[in-house]
Swiss-Prot record:
Superkingdom per UniProt: Bacteria
EC main group: transferase
Residue positions of the active site: H189 (proton acceptor)
SMART domains with a match to the protein in the record: CAT
Protein name (Swiss-Prot/TrEMBL): Chloramphenicol acetyltransferase
Keywords: Acyltransferase, Antibiotic resistance, Plasmid, Transferase
Disulfide pairings: none
Job of this protein: This enzyme is an effector of chloramphenicol resistance in bacteria.
Organism: Staphylococcus intermedius
Catalyzed reactions: chloramphenicol + acetyl-CoA = chloramphenicol 3-acetate + CoA
Amino acid sequence: MTFNIIKLENWDRKEYFEHYFNQQTTYSITKEIDITLFKDMIKKKGYEIYPSLIYAIMEVVNKNKVFRTGINSENKLGYWDKLNPLYTVFNKQTEKFTNIWTESDNNFTSFYNNYKNDLFEYKDKEEMFPKKPIPENTIPISMIPWIDFSSFNLNIGNNSSFLLPIITIGKFYSENNKIYIPVALQLHHAVCDGYHASLFINEFQDIIKKVDDWI
């Protein structure tokens, strides 16, 4: 992984970053996403929905530098060339979850196979983070498949330097002959404004609609 340093004094977002970082301003937005065609196509091809959604999320994240901007372990501001998903997997027996990361790949089939291999290896481990070491360039993704929701918010402790997005997916539901899932996006205002939240949602919806192009 490559971490590219941002020189704050020369950054065109310096004023906004300092203001919102000092305030520790984060926000969340939840939007229902139409997955009617997507769900049908995934089912026909014999794939699982969760890793397919993770792939679509990572395509948006890795396409846009703003979603890869963060602070590394050396307390340096910058952006990674690529992020990998760190996603939750629920264990029905223990009623707890594990967090597993998988290498991102632009090719869906390659990513899906890597996901399945990691899932087989680590899903039954009774640890919160069974696959170690966890690289710095990961982004949290989770799914709450038991309920659909109209809003969802996560709060990280004060003085946190975590700037990357956090994505949470809910249960899909039917309405007016269409199928939707709620997607909650948690962002840090120091690096992402409302425009960027809209960018994520719109591009995610677009890649979901164009599932024929990549599956």
